[in-house]
Regions:
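Solvent-exposed interaction surfaces and binding hotspots enriched for charged
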Residues: 1-108
């Protein structure tokens, strides 16, 4: 769960901000605008960075550590989808219309 207490966030936030700025460096002049091509390159660098962080903090691999890490990565994916993708898709449904076959699943 990413909702850690404020003290833990305080310890991490400046490092995270610095890393994010470092990753963005050279990709965009304006943080509001990045091409899909540049974003693809940036995602590769994010993947590299996360892979190194995971490897360095895991120390020696074990089945249980690998299982826990893959579980956390899955949770990150699900939370991103729940918080970012789902609201975006709901906006698009309202603006462009729903898929007609899905109407039977709509909540009252």
């Amino acid at each position: 769960m990413p909702y850690i207490d404020e003290d833990a966030r305080f310890e991490l936030d400046s490092c995270i901000d610095e890393m994010a700025d470092c990753l963005m460096l050279g990709h965009v002049n304006n943080k509001e605008d990045i091409s899909n091509e540049e974003f693809t390159v940036l995602l590769g660098e994010i993947n590299y960075s996360f892979s190194r962080i995971i490897s360095k903090t895991m120390c020696e691999p074990s089945y249980s550590k690998i299982a826990m890490i893959t579980g956390v990565l899955e949770n990150i994916k699900q939370e991103f989808y729940r918080r970012v993708a789902e609201p975006y898709e709901n906006i698009k449904i309202r603006s462009n219309g729903d898929i007609k076959e899905y109407s039977k699943y709509t909540r009252p």
